[in-house]
Protein backbone atom coordinates (compact mmCIF):
# COMPACT_ATOMS: atom_id res chain seq x y z
CA UNK A 1 0.00 0.00 0.00
CA UNK A 2 1.47 3.34 -1.03
CA UNK A 3 1.75 6.25 1.40
CA UNK A 4 -0.98 8.37 -0.24
CA UNK A 5 -3.50 5.52 -0.10
CA UNK A 6 -2.68 4.88 3.55
CA UNK A 7 -3.14 8.56 4.45
CA UNK A 8 -6.55 8.62 2.74
CA UNK A 9 -7.68 5.56 4.71
CA UNK A 10 -6.43 7.03 7.98
CA UNK A 11 -8.24 10.30 7.27
CA UNK A 12 -11.52 8.45 6.61
CA UNK A 13 -11.08 6.51 9.84
CA UNK A 14 -10.42 9.73 11.77
CA UNK A 15 -13.52 11.36 10.27
CA UNK A 16 -15.65 8.33 11.15
CA UNK A 17 -14.38 8.34 14.73
CA UNK A 18 -15.11 12.07 15.03
CA UNK A 19 -18.70 11.51 13.88
CA UNK A 20 -19.10 8.72 16.43
CA UNK A 21 -17.61 10.83 19.22
CA UNK A 22 -17.95 14.50 18.21
CA UNK A 23 -15.84 17.10 20.00
CA UNK A 24 -17.22 18.47 23.24
CA UNK A 25 -19.65 21.32 22.68
CA UNK A 26 -18.74 24.73 24.00
CA UNK A 27 -19.82 28.34 23.77
CA UNK A 28 -17.44 30.68 22.01
CA UNK A 29 -17.12 34.39 22.75
CA UNK A 30 -19.35 34.42 25.83
CA UNK A 31 -17.97 37.78 26.89
CA UNK A 32 -18.40 39.27 23.43
CA UNK A 33 -22.18 39.14 23.19
CA UNK A 34 -25.31 39.49 25.33
CA UNK A 35 -27.45 37.11 23.26
CA UNK A 36 -27.05 33.71 21.61
CA UNK A 37 -29.05 31.23 19.53
CA UNK A 38 -28.76 27.48 19.97
CA UNK A 39 -28.47 25.67 16.62
CA UNK A 40 -29.37 22.02 17.01
CA UNK A 41 -28.01 20.86 13.64
CA UNK A 42 -24.50 22.06 14.34
CA UNK A 43 -24.62 21.95 18.13
CA UNK A 44 -23.30 25.50 18.18
CA UNK A 45 -24.47 28.33 20.39
CA UNK A 46 -24.12 31.24 18.00
CA UNK A 47 -23.57 34.78 19.31
CA UNK A 48 -25.92 37.57 18.17
CA UNK A 49 -24.29 40.90 17.41
CA UNK A 50 -27.40 42.99 18.11
CA UNK A 51 -30.49 41.63 19.88
CA UNK A 52 -33.73 42.68 18.19
CA UNK A 53 -35.52 44.47 21.04
CA UNK A 54 -36.95 47.76 22.25
CA UNK A 55 -36.56 49.52 25.58
CA UNK A 56 -38.80 48.35 28.41
CA UNK A 57 -40.38 51.78 28.75
CA UNK A 58 -41.83 51.57 25.23
CA UNK A 59 -43.90 48.50 26.09
CA UNK A 60 -47.34 49.91 26.87
CA UNK A 61 -50.42 48.33 28.45
CA UNK A 62 -48.58 45.52 30.26
CA UNK A 63 -47.48 47.21 33.49
CA UNK A 64 -48.22 44.24 35.82
CA UNK A 65 -46.53 41.80 33.45
CA UNK A 66 -43.42 44.00 33.25
CA UNK A 67 -43.11 44.17 37.04
CA UNK A 68 -43.63 40.43 37.54
CA UNK A 69 -41.01 39.39 34.99
CA UNK A 70 -38.52 42.12 35.91
CA UNK A 71 -38.67 41.26 39.62
CA UNK A 72 -38.24 37.56 38.89
CA UNK A 73 -35.29 38.21 36.57
CA UNK A 74 -33.54 40.60 38.94
CA UNK A 75 -33.86 37.97 41.68
CA UNK A 76 -32.30 35.39 39.39
CA UNK A 77 -29.47 37.77 38.52
CA UNK A 78 -28.81 38.39 42.22
CA UNK A 79 -28.65 34.70 43.16
CA UNK A 80 -32.07 34.85 44.83
CA UNK A 81 -34.87 32.31 44.30
CA UNK A 82 -36.66 32.75 40.96
CA UNK A 83 -39.15 30.76 38.89
CA UNK A 84 -39.32 29.50 35.35
CA UNK A 85 -41.99 31.57 33.58
CA UNK A 86 -44.65 30.85 30.97
CA UNK A 87 -45.83 33.97 29.16
CA UNK A 88 -49.09 33.02 27.48
CA UNK A 89 -51.84 34.81 25.60
CA UNK A 90 -52.88 36.49 22.38
CA UNK A 91 -50.51 36.88 19.45
CA UNK A 92 -48.58 40.11 19.09
CA UNK A 93 -49.15 41.28 22.66
CA UNK A 94 -45.48 41.60 23.59
CA UNK A 95 -44.59 38.29 25.21
CA UNK A 96 -41.19 37.68 23.63
CA UNK A 97 -40.52 41.43 23.41
CA UNK A 98 -40.94 41.63 27.17
CA UNK A 99 -38.38 38.90 27.82
CA UNK A 100 -35.78 40.62 25.64
CA UNK A 101 -36.52 44.07 27.06
CA UNK A 102 -36.39 42.84 30.67
CA UNK A 103 -33.03 41.21 29.96
CA UNK A 104 -31.69 44.54 28.71
CA UNK A 105 -33.16 46.46 31.67
CA UNK A 106 -31.60 44.10 34.21
CA UNK A 107 -28.22 44.42 32.49
CA UNK A 108 -28.47 48.21 32.64
CA UNK A 109 -29.56 48.33 36.29
CA UNK A 110 -27.13 45.75 37.66
CA UNK A 111 -24.14 46.60 35.44
CA UNK A 112 -23.73 42.85 35.07
CA UNK A 113 -21.79 41.38 32.18
CA UNK A 114 -22.67 37.82 33.01
CA UNK A 115 -26.43 37.58 32.37
CA UNK A 116 -26.88 36.07 28.91
CA UNK A 117 -29.98 35.47 26.79
CA UNK A 118 -30.01 32.17 24.87
CA UNK A 119 -32.83 31.30 22.45
CA UNK A 120 -33.75 27.71 21.65
CA UNK A 121 -36.21 27.05 18.84
CA UNK A 122 -39.39 25.16 19.58
CA UNK A 123 -38.47 22.35 17.17
CA UNK A 124 -35.19 21.80 19.07
CA UNK A 125 -36.76 21.44 22.50
CA UNK A 126 -35.79 17.75 22.65
CA UNK A 127 -32.18 19.00 22.97
CA UNK A 128 -33.05 20.93 26.12
CA UNK A 129 -31.53 18.48 28.65
CA UNK A 130 -28.24 18.45 26.72
CA UNK A 131 -28.25 22.25 26.44
CA UNK A 132 -28.89 22.67 30.16
CA UNK A 133 -25.99 20.35 30.89
CA UNK A 134 -23.73 22.48 28.70
CA UNK A 135 -24.82 25.80 30.24
CA UNK A 136 -24.33 24.42 33.75
CA UNK A 137 -20.58 24.19 33.09
CA UNK A 138 -20.28 27.98 32.79
CA UNK A 139 -20.92 28.73 36.43
CA UNK A 140 -19.64 32.31 36.28
CA UNK A 141 -22.54 33.19 33.96
CA UNK A 142 -26.30 33.18 34.29
CA UNK A 143 -28.53 32.25 31.37
CA UNK A 144 -32.09 33.18 30.50
CA UNK A 145 -33.15 30.38 28.17
CA UNK A 146 -35.96 31.60 25.89
CA UNK A 147 -38.24 29.43 23.77
CA UNK A 148 -40.63 31.55 21.71
CA UNK A 149 -44.03 30.29 20.54
CA UNK A 150 -43.81 27.01 22.42
CA UNK A 151 -46.65 24.53 21.92
CA UNK A 152 -47.16 20.84 21.21
CA UNK A 153 -49.42 19.16 18.67
CA UNK A 154 -51.03 15.73 18.49
CA UNK A 155 -48.56 12.86 18.38
CA UNK A 156 -45.63 14.84 19.73
CA UNK A 157 -43.68 13.43 22.64
CA UNK A 158 -41.04 16.14 22.90
CA UNK A 159 -43.03 17.71 25.74
CA UNK A 160 -41.63 14.92 27.91
CA UNK A 161 -38.12 16.30 27.36
CA UNK A 162 -39.33 19.68 28.56
CA UNK A 163 -40.96 18.20 31.65
CA UNK A 164 -37.81 16.29 32.52
CA UNK A 165 -35.62 19.34 32.00
CA UNK A 166 -37.80 21.64 34.09
CA UNK A 167 -38.03 19.10 36.89
CA UNK A 168 -34.31 18.50 36.75
CA UNK A 169 -34.48 14.83 37.72
CA UNK A 170 -32.07 13.61 40.37
CA UNK A 171 -29.44 16.05 39.11
CA UNK A 172 -31.66 19.09 39.57
CA UNK A 173 -32.00 22.08 37.26
CA UNK A 174 -28.80 24.14 36.98
CA UNK A 175 -28.81 27.11 39.36
CA UNK A 176 -27.39 29.37 36.66
CA UNK A 177 -30.23 28.78 34.17
CA UNK A 178 -33.83 30.01 34.13
CA UNK A 179 -36.35 29.03 31.46
CA UNK A 180 -38.80 31.51 29.93
CA UNK A 181 -41.31 30.31 27.31
CA UNK A 182 -43.95 32.18 25.34
CA UNK A 183 -47.06 30.51 23.98
CA UNK A 184 -50.51 31.25 22.64
CA UNK A 185 -51.80 28.35 24.77
CA UNK A 186 -52.01 28.44 28.52
CA UNK A 187 -51.48 24.68 28.83
CA UNK A 188 -49.18 24.43 25.78
CA UNK A 189 -51.53 21.83 24.25
CA UNK A 190 -54.52 22.44 21.94
CA UNK A 191 -57.86 21.75 23.61
CA UNK A 192 -58.90 19.19 20.97
CA UNK A 193 -55.70 17.23 21.63
CA UNK A 194 -56.49 16.97 25.34
CA UNK A 195 -60.12 16.04 24.60
CA UNK A 196 -58.96 13.34 22.20
CA UNK A 197 -56.64 11.96 24.88
CA UNK A 198 -59.54 11.90 27.29
CA UNK A 199 -61.72 9.89 24.90
CA UNK A 200 -59.11 7.32 23.79
CA UNK A 201 -56.87 6.77 26.82
CA UNK A 202 -57.18 3.75 29.08
CA UNK A 203 -57.11 6.09 32.04
CA UNK A 204 -58.35 9.42 30.61
CA UNK A 205 -57.81 11.53 33.70
CA UNK A 206 -54.17 10.47 34.07
CA UNK A 207 -53.40 10.99 30.37
CA UNK A 208 -54.82 14.49 30.27
CA UNK A 209 -53.30 15.35 33.64
CA UNK A 210 -49.84 14.47 32.33
CA UNK A 211 -50.17 17.03 29.54
CA UNK A 212 -51.89 19.76 31.53
CA UNK A 213 -49.30 19.37 34.29
CA UNK A 214 -46.61 20.49 31.86
CA UNK A 215 -47.58 24.12 32.43
CA UNK A 216 -47.44 23.48 36.18
CA UNK A 217 -43.67 23.16 35.84
CA UNK A 218 -43.59 26.93 35.38
CA UNK A 219 -43.74 28.73 38.70
CA UNK A 220 -44.93 31.92 37.01
CA UNK A 221 -47.87 32.16 34.61
CA UNK A 222 -47.95 35.62 33.07
CA UNK A 223 -51.07 36.29 31.00
CA UNK A 224 -51.33 38.67 28.03
CA UNK A 225 -54.66 39.77 26.58
CA UNK A 226 -56.01 41.79 23.68
CA UNK A 227 -55.58 45.51 24.25
CA UNK A 228 -58.08 48.36 24.14
CA UNK A 229 -58.20 51.02 21.46
CA UNK A 230 -56.75 53.60 23.86
CA UNK A 231 -53.81 51.34 24.72
CA UNK A 232 -53.20 50.64 21.04
CA UNK A 233 -53.05 54.38 20.35
CA UNK A 234 -50.78 54.90 23.37
CA UNK A 235 -48.33 52.39 21.88
CA UNK A 236 -48.41 54.14 18.51
CA UNK A 237 -47.91 57.57 20.11
CA UNK A 238 -44.99 56.30 22.20
CA UNK A 239 -43.19 55.02 19.10
CA UNK A 240 -43.90 58.19 17.12
CA UNK A 241 -42.50 60.33 19.94
CA UNK A 242 -39.48 58.09 20.45
CA UNK A 243 -38.46 58.18 16.78
CA UNK A 244 -39.57 61.77 16.04
CA UNK A 245 -41.81 60.75 13.15
CA UNK A 246 -43.35 63.86 11.58
CA UNK A 247 -47.13 63.40 11.35
CA UNK A 248 -50.22 65.40 12.25
CA UNK A 249 -51.92 64.16 15.45
CA UNK A 250 -55.36 63.89 13.88
CA UNK A 251 -53.99 62.10 10.86
CA UNK A 252 -52.00 59.79 13.12
CA UNK A 253 -55.07 58.71 15.08
CA UNK A 254 -57.20 58.17 11.98
CA UNK A 255 -54.52 56.26 10.10
CA UNK A 256 -53.61 54.13 13.12
CA UNK A 257 -57.23 53.09 13.65
CA UNK A 258 -57.72 52.36 9.96
CA UNK A 259 -54.57 50.24 10.00
CA UNK A 260 -55.82 48.15 12.94
CA UNK A 261 -59.21 47.67 11.26
CA UNK A 262 -57.65 46.39 8.05
CA UNK A 263 -55.47 44.00 10.09
CA UNK A 264 -58.45 42.83 12.11
CA UNK A 265 -56.57 43.24 15.38
CA UNK A 266 -55.16 45.69 17.91
CA UNK A 267 -51.85 44.67 19.41
CA UNK A 268 -48.33 45.87 20.02
CA UNK A 269 -47.20 44.06 16.88
CA UNK A 270 -49.86 45.73 14.73
CA UNK A 271 -48.90 49.12 16.23
CA UNK A 272 -45.24 48.51 15.40
CA UNK A 273 -46.05 47.51 11.83
CA UNK A 274 -48.07 50.71 11.42
CA UNK A 275 -45.22 52.81 12.79
CA UNK A 276 -42.78 51.17 10.39
CA UNK A 277 -45.13 52.05 7.54
CA UNK A 278 -45.48 55.75 8.41
CA UNK A 279 -41.76 56.02 9.20
CA UNK A 280 -40.95 54.66 5.76
CA UNK A 281 -43.37 57.04 4.08
CA UNK A 282 -41.86 60.02 5.91
CA UNK A 283 -38.29 58.81 5.23
CA UNK A 284 -37.61 58.64 8.98
CA UNK A 285 -34.99 56.20 10.22
CA UNK A 286 -36.08 54.41 13.36
CA UNK A 287 -32.86 52.54 14.13
Q: At which residue positions do the language-model features occur?
A:
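Conserved catalytic/switch belt of AAA+ P-loop NTPases
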Residues: 107-108, 136-137, 154-200
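C-terminal alpha-helical "lid" subdomain
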Residues: 225-287
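AAA+/P-loop NTPase substrate/partner-engagement loops
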Residues: 105-143, 150-155
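Pre-Walker A adenine-sensing motif
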Residues: 64-78
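Dynamic helix-loop-helix/coil hinge segments at AAA+ ATPase domain boundaries and subdomain interfaces
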Residues: 4-5, 44-68
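Conserved AAA+ ATPase "SRH/arginine-finger" region at the nucleotide-binding site
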Residues: 183, 199-212, 219-233
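Interdomain "pre-motor" coupling segment immediately N-terminal to P-loop NTPase/helicase cores
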Residues: 2-47
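Walker A/P-loop nucleotide-binding motif
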Residues: 79-101
Amino acid sequence: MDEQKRDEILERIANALERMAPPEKKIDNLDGSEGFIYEAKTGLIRPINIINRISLGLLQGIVPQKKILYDNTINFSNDLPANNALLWGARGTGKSSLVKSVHEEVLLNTKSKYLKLVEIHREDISDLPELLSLLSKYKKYKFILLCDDLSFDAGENTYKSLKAALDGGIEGKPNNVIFYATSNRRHLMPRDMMENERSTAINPSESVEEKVSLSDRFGLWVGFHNISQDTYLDIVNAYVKKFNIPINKKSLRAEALEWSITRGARSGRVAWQFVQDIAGKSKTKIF
